[in-house]
From Swiss-Prot:
Top EC class of this enzyme: transferase
Protein name (Swiss-Prot/TrEMBL): 4-diphosphocytidyl-2-C-methyl-D-erythritol kinase
Enzyme nomenclature, EC number: 2.7.1.148
Record GO biological process: isopentenyl diphosphate biosynthetic process, methylerythritol 4-phosphate pathway; terpenoid biosynthetic process
Protein family per UniProt: Belongs to the GHMP kinase family. IspE subfamily.
Gene from which this protein is expressed: ispE
Gene3D superfamilies assigned: 3.30.230.10, GHMP kinase, C-terminal domain (3.30.70.890)
Organism placement in taxonomy: Bacteria, Pseudomonadati, Pseudomonadota, Betaproteobacteria, Burkholderiales
Pathway: Isoprenoid biosynthesis; isopentenyl diphosphate biosynthesis via DXP pathway; isopentenyl diphosphate from 1-deoxy-D-xylulose 5-phosphate: step 3/6
Pfam families the UniProt entry points to: GHMP_kinases_C, GHMP_kinases_N
Active site: K14, D139
Domain of life (superkingdom): Bacteria
Residues that hold ATP according to the record: P97, M98, G99, A100, G101, M102, G103, G104, G105, S106, S107
Functional summary from the UniProt entry: Catalyzes the phosphorylation of the position 2 hydroxy group of 4-diphosphocytidyl-2C-methyl-D-erythritol.
Catalytic activity field: 4-CDP-2-C-methyl-D-erythritol + ATP = 4-CDP-2-C-methyl-D-erythritol 2-phosphate + ADP + H(+)
Organism: Polynucleobacter necessarius subsp. necessarius (strain STIR1)
Length: 296
């Protein structure tokens, strides 16, 4: 094990290539099927080991109390679980929009667990980190899992899936969406027929729908506006929403004029954010972990 004083790791976003709601548990949690694709739209997490027995966030998000800050919660959860004597300073550089349906907060929490497991020399397994991550949010275990996945249950059942890594056009229409506002809506489809992983791999083009999209479009008109922008920018594409929104995306093929597309992005409505991003096959946080020969 390498002894570290500090660590900087990238926290990637994800896209839901499709999202089906297939049922609901008695406790109210929804059962889903989805394919999660990692993308190279990343936050950067800086962790510095300190002797004080405290978790300190250097640049807290305005308006977010520490008890609601996922990276602080993740650090304290791990610290308490291992009864670790010592602390950390956390500096998070945000690039992934909040409330975008791309898992930015969950990814940051996962990277905090991954990074502190190394920084504090805890030697916890991925399975243990995933179990801890699930206490923070349904998407956190996916980012700890670290590979593209066919996801089921409430998000805790994952099977690695081999995906191509194309370019994507992603637009965030500057509208944060609270997941609860979508999943509590009475018009949300909750009985989508289940599919198999083989069914998806055989005919992926048949599975490009998001059951949350119709509800989001009705409540948040910016979602439809963003979908219309992508349709205009990439004619013939099949844009859809990621997660519970509000980000929308389209897969780009090799014929897409990327330079022209980037010019298009400069003319988005004020406050909107758009990027051309590349799909990933692995959480980049693990690239540094592997380089440092830290086992997980």
């Amino acid at each position: 094990m390498v002894n570290l004083d500090s660590l900087s790791l990238r926290s990637p976003a994800k896209l839901n290539l499709f999202l089906h709601i297939v049922g609901r548990r008695t406790d109210g949690y929804h059962l889903l099927q989805s394919v999660f694709q990692l993308i190279d739209w990343c936050d950067t997490l800086h962790l510095k080991r300190i002797s004080e027995n405290v978790v300190r966030r250097i640049n807290p998000i305005p308006g977010v109390a520490p008890e609601h800050d996922l990276v602080v919660r993740a650090a304290n959860l791990l610290k308490d679980f291992c009864q670790f004597e010592g602390g950390v300073e956390i500096n998070l550089q945000k690039e992934i929009p909040m409330g975008a349906g791309m898992g930015g907060g969950s990814s940051d929490a996962a990277t905090t667990l991954i990074g502190l497991n190394a920084l504090w020399s805890l030697n916890l397994s991925k399975e243990t980190l995933c179990a801890l991550g699930l206490k923070l949010g349904a998407d956190v275990p996916f980012f700890i899992f670290g590979k593209n996945a066919f996801v089921e249950g409430v998000g805790e059942k994952m099977r690695e899936i081999s995906l191509e890594t194309p370019d994507f056009l992603v637009i965030f229409p500057n509208r944060g969406i609270a997941t609860a506002s979508i999943f509590q809506d009475p018009e949300l489809t909750r009985d989508h027929a289940q599919i198999t992983i083989d069914g998806f791999l055989t005919s992926p083009l048949l599975y490009q729908s998001n059951d949350c999209q119709a509800v989001a479009m009705r409540i948040y008109p910016e979602v439809k506006q963003a979908l219309d922008w992508i349709t205009q920018a990439v004619p013939g594409s099949q844009p859809r929403m990621s997660g519970s929104g509000s980000s929308v995306f389209a897969v780009l093929d090799s014929k897409t004029d990327i330079a022209k597309l980037k010019n298009f992005l400069q003319n988005l409505p004020k406050g909107w954010v758009g990027r051309v991003v590349r799909g990933l096959n692995k959480n980049p946080a693990y690239n540094l972990i592997s380089f440092l020969q830290i086992d997980l």
